[in-house]
Amino acid sequence: MPGKKSPYGLFAGGKLKKKRQKFRWNDVTYKRRMLGLAEKYDPLEGAPMARGIVLEKVGVEARKPNAAVRKCVRVQLVKNGKVVTAFVPYDGGLNYINEHDEVIIERIGGPEGKSLGDIPGVRFKVVKVNGVSLWAIWRGKKQKPTR
């Protein structure tokens, strides 16, 4: 009669628990969470928002089946110097952003921290320009301050 894979008995709980723990490392999401890989390679370093300087305006082509040029900006983060692409929301929102403006960016809210919808490789969006909400500027409620 061949041996059993798992111990069984009144005091086998510790051994079973230890064995389960060992096999959890085969799960990709568990491994990434335990090793802190999301924070390690995150440009925002775990923070909800970040401040940056606009380097250039870029147009990102939308994924199929859509045919559009999504307006984005390349932003260099102040905290670590990393350069990321951020989506500019609202119709004509790019008109209120110039190069060398200071912007606040946040995550765009895609699944698993990835890009959202038909915008490939863009994981962030612009929230504020020169300390004023982009939405307020776009609505005409506030004026964009000149620096």
From Swiss-Prot:
One of its GO terms (molecular function) is structural constituent of ribosome. One of its GO terms (biological process) is translation. Part of the 30S ribosomal subunit. With S4 and S5 plays an important role in translational accuracy. Located at the interface of the 30S and 50S subunits. It comes from Pyrobaculum calidifontis (strain DSM 21063 / JCM 11548 / VA1). The gene is rps12. This is Small ribosomal subunit protein uS12. Keywords: Ribonucleoprotein, Ribosomal protein, RNA-binding, rRNA-binding. The lineage of its organism: Archaea, Thermoproteota, Thermoprotei, Thermoproteales, Thermoproteaceae. Pfam families: Ribosom_S12_S23. SUPFAM superfamilies: Nucleic acid-binding proteins. InterPro entries: NA-bd_OB-fold (IPR012340), Ribosomal_uS12 (IPR006032), Ribosomal_uS12_arc (IPR022863), Ribosomal_uS12_euk/arc (IPR005680).
